Amino acid sequence: IEVYIRINSSTSRYYEEDLNYIQNAIPSDSIVKGIFLPKVESYKQIEDLSFRISQFNNASLEIVPMIETKSGLANLTKILDSDENNKLFDFVHYGHFDYCLSAGIWPFSTPRDVEFWDIIKYILSELNNHSKSFVHTPFPFPEDKTLFWQSIFYLMDLFPKVDIMYSTLNIDLSLTLPEDNLGAINPTQCKLSTKELISQAELICREFLENRANKRSFAISNGCFIPPHQYIAAKEYLSKHK
C-alpha cells in the first residue's frame, strides 16, 4: 500500500503546521510515499517544498503538484520546463472543481462536455511532451459505471502513451469491469440559456444544502458529487444574474 498526503497550499496558514506534523510524526519507514501540494502556480512552490522535505527523516517523499487555479494552468508549461533537469516530480494532478471556481466557470463542466475535455487534452499534451504522468480529477458521478469507463476509454484513445492515475474518490469504480463492447464517450458542447443556468445554480445550491455530509463537506445527490466549490460558484452566479 502506498499512501499520499494532501497538505494545505503553501499560501495557507496551516501549511507550516502540516509540514511540521509530517516531519515529526511520520517515520522514515512509513507507508506514506508522497505529498500532494495544492494550488501550485509556480515552480518555486515545488522547490520550496522539496527543500523542506530534504530536512525530513523521510527525505524521499515524492511531490505531486496540483493544478487547481487559472494561474496554475496558465503557468503549467513554465512549471514543467523548469523541472526538466531537476526532476522534482513525476506526477501532476488536475483539480477540476477548484479550477472551475478559480476561473469563474459556470456551470462546472462534466465528462459529458467538450469543455471538460478541452482542459484535460491541454494538460495531457503538456505532460506527454515532458514525460510526466497524470493524476485525474475526481469523477463526479460515483455511481455511473458506464460513464466512468466511457470516459476512461476516451482518455486512452486521446493519449495512449500517457500514464494516468485515478482519484481515490473513484476507487470502487476503477475496480469494476467495463461492459462488453462499451466505447468511448462522445462529449457535446454545453449550451444553456441564462434561464437554464440560473435554474441549474438554484438546483445545485438546494441539493448541496440538503444532502451534504456535514457543514464543511461535500454532498451526493441523484448520483452526482457536489463539492463546496460548486455550491460557492453557484451562489456567485446567482448573485450576478438573478
What is each model feature region?
Residues 1-242:
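Expand to "…catalyze enediolate/carbanion chemistry for C-C bond making/breaking, isomerization
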